[in-house]
Amino acid sequence: MNRRTLYNEFLFQFPLEKIRNMKLDEYTNLNRENSFCYWLESKTVELGSIWGGSSYKFGIYRYDKRPDNPSVVVSDEEYAWYKKYNASNRDEAFEIVLKAIVTIAESALSGNLEAIEEENTFGNVVKWKIAFLYANEMLLPIYKRDMLEKAASKLGYSDSAKAKIYELQHFLMSQKGGSSAARREAL
């Protein structure tokens, strides 16, 4: 499957309307092939990798083996979620995660990249992958800050280490020409 087809398939599987009403077991489950998290990390890897790290990066996840890291996560009999959410149960934790996903997706669609930058429910890699998938080809599929900094510096951006991620994305897209044809090539 080429990247264009994969991109469209993701949007077919997870349109914004579906995301707004997504249930926890659609977000994360042990039948990995149909969950949002599986698509985000594995199925769409050709649209930029977010591999590595633990499942914590998704905010809440269904586990096979109960995590043993009480300083970072809270868990019940099926799910684990970040302690920093101060959620008393899985439903509260998922509400926080889902709100963040919707905010990121809506902000990406409207071009409000500053709002994505400010969102802190997820780490940068996860939130910018979500943003890329909903941004109508206005972002590059590069999610790691250091990679964006290197690319921007190489193309003449001064002091890329102090720039916001959305500023680096804007700059890099402008260097590609910013046309819809150039954006399609980014896929």
Please identify what each model-predicted range represents:
Residues 1-124, 135-187:
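An N-terminal alpha-helical hairpin/helix-loop-helix interaction module that forms a charged
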Residues 127-133:
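Short hydrophobic alpha-helical segments that form membrane-spanning helices or hydrophobic packing faces
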